[in-house]
């Protein structure tokens, strides 16, 4: 029996085939669209990442120090405040508040001086009592030397080649990264110090087998903690200038002292509350203030014109100052970068060989005046509450104001590496923003420096609590940003400098305009960590004037709630995430179109599901409607039947066997069994 199958194709199979083909095509199209959108968004983010890297590369190079070419308006700027220490000796001492004492792993010190003495202390930074950490810049036998102790051993780095007590002006730079240190005077060769290997760890590894197991982990942790303490300058308390407290008085000139963002001489010239001046100390020239409308410059030798690094802003507290209504905001300090390695892991990361001759450091004070226009002549003045609230004047940046400011000769907001800012062609800088940072604690930090460890981060940066407000014209309003160390995504179109505040001409008829009350809007819930934690209580007697808004790119953009404070203009806060309100991202870099991605994904999923269902239905149909074959029976044998109609001869042949069987049965019956 051989089966012969006859294939039966249903007629609807020809109709289903185009449908399946269309589903497959739709799935492929949806996946391609999704991948295209993802690719475009990834390409956009990659381009933004490259742009951010470009900006970061323009700001730090090596990583923890920001280097850029100075604009023409700053090249040849003066060295800040200058003091002369007389023969009787003097002392300028800055004291950190008890709750703001920093601990650092990287320190940078720069100062210009001219003297004729052979021995004296220029600057000394000391830690809290009983800790013993210090950094001291002094002159010994007519040569510059820096001695520091961040653990148990005094480490000295000295300029051995040339004496500096020749009465000429010299600039000295000192940089410390952990136990590594560099010292450079003018353009002379760099003196370096690198610590030797950790002998404690080596001895521990040798004796590890003999230490009981339960003591191995505590000993190892103790050694690591000891090594960590030997790289951190803990709890810095005072900065002493002049050496009169150490019986090694300095005589001569000191200019533009810079230490980790603090310009102590400028702060002393402005009468900072935390600075005390004793002895024979005299200020040379006028007091460098940020409210002076004119910029004073002094010529420098041509060999002192080189690259500059951007540093942070020091804001002095005003709670203890008397007879002052607005606080003084100190401007940024620009220091020429040195050729040392500025990375914390110098043993693992090689230094850049492009700085082989060294570059000169000049402390440069950039004076950008800021004028706080009055809000209204009929508004009574309310003094600041003692909560370290700095008064910030927010001036909206529009196309017209930028053009007016450029024509008036005010420098552009962002001048990092761009020479076109120096041209007086009146071009509009639509992408620039005005960045105003207020830190009531007076603590400063460098946003380009990543936090090195927990101790450095929480002791140095945790006290900076106030917001950083920045304006940009393409959004048509203000943006309230988080502190700089949390700012990861938003980058303006052009780099702007924190702390550089540029004066904008006051709005016309601001004094004579009538004060109009501002209706308070219900403030939504603000996410934790996004805004200032301090409660803002608006004063009922204060009348605030709203500023004219600039052109709005998005007509559907909601206006955020306003935060009102005494002597503050109406400042829109960041838009929190509230149902029913569409949040506008702060920058174009965060705008990602999701409609095409969602559509492609949905089409792909639906097409794939339809294809699977069709395949399953087809398989079930084939299983249930299997083709039944036609069988051909070929009977080539005739079987013998036991019926009575069969041939008699056959019956006779079978009879003997029947008899034999019948004969055997009686024999079986005749058997007897005995038990």
Swiss-Prot record:
Q: Which domain of life is it from?
A: Eukaryota
Post-translational modifications reported in the UniProt record? Processed by alpha-secretase leading to the formation of an extracellular soluble protein as well as a C-terminal membrane-embedded fragment (CTF). Proteolysis of these CTFs by gamma-secretase releases intracellular domains (ICDs) and extracellular peptides.
Q: Which Pfam families match?
A: Laminin_G_2 (PF02210), Syndecan (PF01034)
Enumerate the UniProt keywords alphabetically: Angiogenesis, Cell adhesion, Membrane, Signal, Transmembrane, Transmembrane helix
GO terms under cellular component: membrane
Q: Which residues lie on this side of the membrane: Cytoplasmic?
A: 621-675
Q: For bias kind Polar residues, which ranges apply?
A: 325-335
Q: Where is the composition biased (Basic and acidic residues)?
A: 665-675
Annotated InterPro entries: ConA-like_dom_sf, Laminin_G, Neurexin-like, Neurexin-related_CASP, Syndecan/Neurexin_dom
Q: What residue intervals traverse the membrane?
A: 600-620
Q: How does it sit in the membrane?
A: Single-pass type I membrane protein
Side Extracellular, residues: 31-599
Q: Which GO terms describe its biological process?
A: angiogenesis; cell adhesion
Region: Disordered; residue ranges are: 313-337, 490-534, 642-675
**Where found, per UniProt?**
Membrane
What residues does the Laminin G-like domain cover? 81-281
Q: Which Gene3D superfamilies match?
A: 2.60.120.200
- Keyword Nucleotide-binding on this protein? no
Tell me which family the UniProt entry assigns to this protein.
Belongs to the neurexin family.
What is the recorded function of this protein according to its Swiss-Prot or TrEMBL entry?
A: Neuronal cell surface protein that may be involved in cell recognition and cell adhesion.
Specify the protein name: Neurexin-3b-beta
Species assigned in the record: Danio rerio
- What gene name is listed for this protein? nrxn3b
């Amino acid at each position: 029996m051989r089966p012969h199958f006859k294939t039966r194709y249903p007629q609807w199979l020809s109709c289903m085939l185009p449908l399946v083909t269309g589903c497959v095509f739709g799935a492929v199209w949806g996946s391609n669209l999704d991948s295209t959108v993802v690719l475009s968004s990834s390409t956009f983010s990659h381009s933004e990442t490259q742009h951010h890297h470009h900006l970061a590369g323009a700001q730090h190079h090596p990583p923890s120090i920001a280097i850029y070419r100075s604009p023409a308006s700053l090249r040849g700027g003066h060295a800040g405040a200058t003091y002369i220490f007389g023969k009787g000796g003097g002392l300028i001492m800055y004291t950190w508040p008890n709750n703001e004492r920093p601990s650092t792993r990287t320190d940078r010190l720069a100062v210009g001086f001219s003297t004729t003495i052979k021995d004296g202390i220029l600057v000394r930074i000391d830690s809290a009592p009983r800790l013993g950490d210090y950094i001291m810049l002094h002159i010994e036998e007519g040569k510059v030397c820096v001695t520091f102790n961040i653990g148990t051993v005094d480490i000295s780095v000295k300029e051995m080649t040339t004496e500096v007590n020749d009465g000429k002006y010299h600039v000295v730079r000192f940089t410390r990264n952990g136990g590594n240190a560099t010292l450079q005077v003018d353009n002379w060769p760099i003196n370096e110090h690198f610590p030797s290997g950790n002998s404690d760890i080596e001895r521990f590894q040798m004796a590890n087998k003999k230490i009981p197991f339960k003591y191995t982990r505590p000993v190892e942790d103790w050694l690591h903690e000891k090594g960590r303490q030997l790289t951190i300058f803990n709890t810095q308390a005072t900065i002493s200038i002049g050496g009169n407290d150490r019986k090694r008085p300095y005589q001569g000139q000191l200019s533009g002292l810079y230490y980790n963002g603090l310009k102590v001489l400028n702060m002393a010239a402005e009468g900072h509350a935390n600075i005390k001046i004793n002895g024979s100390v005299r200020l040379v020239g006028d007091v460098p203030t940020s409210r002076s409308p004119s910029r004073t410059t002094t010529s420098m030798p041509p060999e002192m014109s080189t690259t500059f690094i951007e540093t942070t802003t020091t804001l002095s507290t005003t709670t203890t100052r008397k007879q002052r209504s607005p606080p003084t905001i100190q401007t940024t300090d620009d220091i020429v970068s040195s050729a040392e390695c500025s990375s914390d892991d110098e043993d693992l990361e090689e230094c850049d060989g492009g700085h082989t001759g060294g570059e000169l450091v000049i402390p440069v004070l950039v004076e950008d005046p800021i004028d706080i226009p009055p809000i209204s002549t009929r508004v009574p003045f309310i003094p600041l509450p003692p909560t370290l609230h700095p008064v910030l004047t927010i001036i909206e940046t529009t196309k017209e104001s930028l053009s007016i400011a450029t024509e008036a000769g005010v420098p552009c907001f962002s001048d990092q590496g761009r020479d076109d800012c120096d041209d007086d062609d009146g071009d509009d800088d639509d992408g620039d923003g005005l960045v105003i940072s207020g830190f009531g604690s007076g603590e400063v930090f460098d946003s380009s420096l990543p936090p090195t460890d927990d101790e450095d981060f929480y002791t140095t940066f945790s006290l900076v609590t106030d917001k950083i407000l920045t304006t940009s014209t393409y959004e048509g309003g203000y943006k309230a940003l988080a502190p700089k160390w949390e700012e990861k995504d938003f980058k303006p179109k052009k780099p702007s400098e924190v702390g550089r505040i540029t004066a904008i001409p006051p709005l016309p008829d601001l004094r004579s305009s009538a004060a109009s009350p501002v209706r308070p809007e219900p403030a939504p819930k603000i996410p934790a960590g996004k805004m200032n934690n301090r409660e803002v209580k608006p004063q009922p007697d204060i009348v605030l004037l709203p500023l004219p808004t600039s052109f709005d790119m998005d007509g559907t953009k909601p206006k955020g709630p306003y935060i009102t404070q005494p002597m503050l203009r109406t400042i829109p806060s960041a838009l929190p995430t509230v149902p029913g309100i569409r949040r506008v991202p702060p920058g174009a870099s965060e705008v990602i179109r999701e409609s095409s991605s969602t559509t492609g994904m949905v089409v792909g999923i639906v097409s794939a599901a339809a294809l699977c269902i069709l395949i399953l239905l087809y398989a079930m149909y084939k299983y249930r409607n299997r083709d039944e074959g036609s069988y051909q029976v070929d009977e080539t044998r005739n079987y013998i039947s036991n019926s009575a109609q069969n041939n008699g001869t056959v019956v006779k042949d079978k009879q003997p066997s029947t008899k034999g069987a019948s004969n055997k049965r009686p024999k079986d019956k005749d058997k007897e069994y005995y038990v």
